[in-house]
């Protein structure tokens, strides 16, 4: 993997850039790329696309950067861009969390990708069905977590099409007229028109769904794991840097 860049072009207060530093980094990236080709290893580069994003958005906002307040350590949005690029390189674009389509008039599941749709019932204007997904949506964190971090994961949506390409849990229902209230496990999620439901809605963007809440639980567990890991790492750093005998 070609590393994320050193941002020489962002305008930061009291932070003079080291000119040509990213050129040096790119020479290392090129060496990695050549080595990967020689050994038939897979390779993807984060440096060039992240630099391109930085420079694109700096045309309107010279203080924009994915690389944090020190030009080199990405903020939360930068880490999400790295994850997006890494997954894209593995062919993850277009992989649905789930994709389901129901014909309300026929009480029939037309499509059920990466999920199971069953027990479809229509009683008057009410439509119900059982839905079991094989994956959870990705819950984009809206909090700037981590020491010194100023941006949240969710800010990644301003710069890459993460939701459209990698985080779609599509519900499409045809044959409905008027407005319909969607409930999952008796939890009201929202109200959509028959036309909107026929076009399809992305449940991964709805934070009140039970599956989104399950995904949040996993996210918080992972944050807890990371805090434990960071604590041990920082302890080892302090022990090495300050407590060893000189």
Describe the role of every protein-language-model region.
Residues 11-12, 54-56, 201:
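Short Asp/Glu-rich motifs
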Residues 1-5, 23-64, 80-98, 179-181, ...:
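Extracellular serine-dependent O-acyl
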Residues 62-246:
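Conserved catalytic region of serine esterases and O-acyltransferases that act on ester linkages
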Residues 4-10, 150:
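Amphipathic repeat-derived elements
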Residues 9-46, 158-172:
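Substrate-gating cap/lid alpha-helix
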Residues 8-10, 50-53, 136-137, 190-191:
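Flexible loop/turn segments at secondary-structure boundaries
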């Amino acid at each position: 993997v070609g590393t994320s860049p050193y941002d020489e072009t962002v305008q930061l207060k009291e932070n003079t850039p080291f000119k040509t530093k990213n050129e040096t980094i790119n020479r290392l990236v090129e060496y990695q790329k050549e080595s990967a080709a020689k050994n038939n290893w897979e390779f993807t580069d984060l440096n060039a696309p992240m630099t391109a994003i930085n420079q694109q958005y700096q045309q309107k906002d010279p203080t924009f950067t994915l690389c944090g307040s020190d030009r080199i350590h990405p903020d939360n949005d930068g880490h999400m861009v790295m994850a997006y690029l890494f997954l894209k390189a593995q062919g993850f674009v277009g992989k649905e969390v789930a994709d389901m389509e129901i014909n309300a008039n026929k009480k029939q599941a037309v499509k059920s990708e990466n999920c199971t749709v069953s027990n479809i019932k229509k009683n008057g204007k009410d439509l119900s069905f059982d839905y079991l997904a094989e994956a959870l949506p990705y819950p984009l964190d809206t909090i700037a977590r981590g020491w010194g971090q100023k941006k949240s994961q969710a800010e990644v949506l301003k710069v890459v099409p993460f939701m459209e390409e990698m985080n779609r849990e599509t519900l499409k229902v045809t044959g409905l007229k008027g407005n319909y209230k969607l409930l999952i496990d008796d939890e009201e999620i929202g109200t959509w028109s028959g036309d909107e439901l026929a076009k399809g809605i992305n449940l991964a963007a709805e934070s009140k769904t039970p599956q989104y809440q399950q995904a949040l639980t996993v996210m918080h567990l992972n944050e807890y794991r990371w805090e434990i890991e960071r604590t041990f790492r920082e302890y080892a750093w302090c022990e090495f840097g300050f407590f060893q005998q000189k």
